[in-house]
Amino acid sequence: ECFTIKKSKLRGVESNGMICAEDEIGIGTDHAGIIVLPETAVPGTLAKDYYNIKSDYVLEVDITPNRADACSHYGVARDLYAYLVQNGKPAALKKPSVEAFAVDNHDLDIRVTVENSEACPHYAGVTVKGVTVKESPEWLQNKLRIIGLRPINNVVDITNYIVHAFGQPLHCFDADKIKGGEVIVKTLPEGTPFTTLDGVERKLNGRDLMICNREEPMCIAGVFGGLDSGSTETTKDVFLESAYFHPTWVRKTARRHGLNTDASFRFERGVDPNATLYCLKLAALMVKELAGGTISSDIKDVCAAPARDFRV
């Protein structure tokens, strides 16, 4: 949250500034204290120039609950595009092409089973084998920092970029941790323990939809990932998930566990069911470009009821 640094006295000494750690000003993850610059740093240089932080425009948009379509950069752009066209103004609406998506081999096939199609009408996934998890390129890190997100690694950053760019939450699993080589979308017995990414062990409700492997749960569907199934610096193969989860199921689960995430915020308002495959293909292409590897399976696409485009 932004605040103004004001002149104050500390132990009788007037202070005109504040000591900030790297993580407090969005240039790194270290919280040790004073940032020590090398002697080559030129006094008077703007911090944004020294750290190569690109300037950009940031728009704050208040979204009413019925405008889930505007919960992304593309959604807002689409709204502006419609307004401009209606008023006779020249405008173009563009998004990245995914025509280059192609399966390189079938070396890592992970099966998908959806046991609860009411809670999950559409689930899709694909594997990318031989990735190198590392820092994202500067342009991607800047895109995330500008909107207040902390870069983590190239694979996770891609999923965060896509959810904010196009409104479709994605999840990335370490493929080696999908026991039995199968992803199963289902509910589990009341009281089943599950530890989420924040290290908290939660007791599941019988109506919490879960993403599981053959032996254990891996993720609370549409809400929060598990502590042990996500990608890390040692991950070599990933399984990318893109899905449409029913808004009511996500909303109730998020409330039960006191969770409010970027994913649940969008799913409980209703994401575009026609964006599922597009965003999955875009994520796979970006992973290939930024983390290497090969697309090593067909897209596993389980769709109970294909959605149709709305006509206005």
Locate predicted features.
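RNA/tRNA-interacting regions in translation and RNA-turnover enzymes
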Residues: 1-312
